[in-house]
UniProtKB/Swiss-Prot annotation:
Binds 2 manganese ions per subunit. Gene3D superfamilies: Ureohydrolase domain. Belongs to the arginase family. This is Arginase. It holds the Pfam family Arginase. It is an enzyme of class 3 (hydrolase). Pathway: Nitrogen metabolism; urea cycle; L-ornithine and urea from L-arginine: step 1/1. It comes from Staphylococcus aureus (strain MRSA252). One of its GO terms (cellular component) is cytoplasm. Mn(2+) 2 binds at residues 126, 128, 229, 231.
Amino acid sequence: MTKKKGIDIIGVPSTFGQRKLGVDLGPTAIRYAGLIPRLKQLDLDVNDKGDIKVSAVDIEKFQSEQNGLRNYDEIIDVTQKLNKEVSASIENNRFPLVLGGDHSIAIGSVSAISKHYNNLGVIWYDAHGDLNIPEESPSGNIHGMPLRILTGEGPKELLELNSNVIKPENIVLIGMRDLDKGERQFIKDHNIKTFTMSDIDKLGIKEVIENTIEYLKSRNVDGVHLSLDVDALDPLETPGTGTRVLGGLTYRESHFALELLHQSQSVTSMDLVEVNPLIDHNNHTAEQSVSLVGTFFGETLL
């Protein structure tokens, strides 16, 4: 963080961006794993604002085949509500820590944050680019589209909530190992700074994070949002997430990455998404997530 701020925790129990029930329980699982006391032990001012109100899941509709964008009205509703909550936190000079929920919630959080910065940078720590558009998405799952929407392309109603779009050149993708054809082309066309798992293997996570920080500084960003999807981590270690891709970042690599980001004091807001306790092992992924967040906010062994 650029300076020590109080933290507002905002839960978003939304599962509407994808097809697996359980990710809506992510905020509860993360809290149950000890997030609040973990942060308070660091002598941080922590305010848990609870969860935003999300529509109940209509199981029959949720499990059915839907034409076009899945659960679109529900996602608009979640986006609007989250946008207001996050914006209020920033106006009160607080650090918004948003707990998902699936990654479609980033449409609401980042669109709110970008209104308060002139040149926001985004670190997308994820196995996927989330850069699809409806025309190129066979699934219609909006959790595969948030970053593209935030750059100004996508469904009209969601774009209207995003008045200050993210510049593609202000984005850094870390952990990529599953990209659709259209996403690969978009990354190439816009020269988005990208670190695939192959790059991380070659460079090491230390150099990747240091390069990320320096790159965003060179872009003269005035804030940095970290969007951390737990599927960036390898599912053999971090199983409780819905879109698993083998060969991901290790738990230790991720700890080190977040330690370096803490030391940089550059990140001004954060999402933590895609924790699904229904497909986890004894809440292991939520516990890992709490430990990672602790490291990000300055927790050390000694």
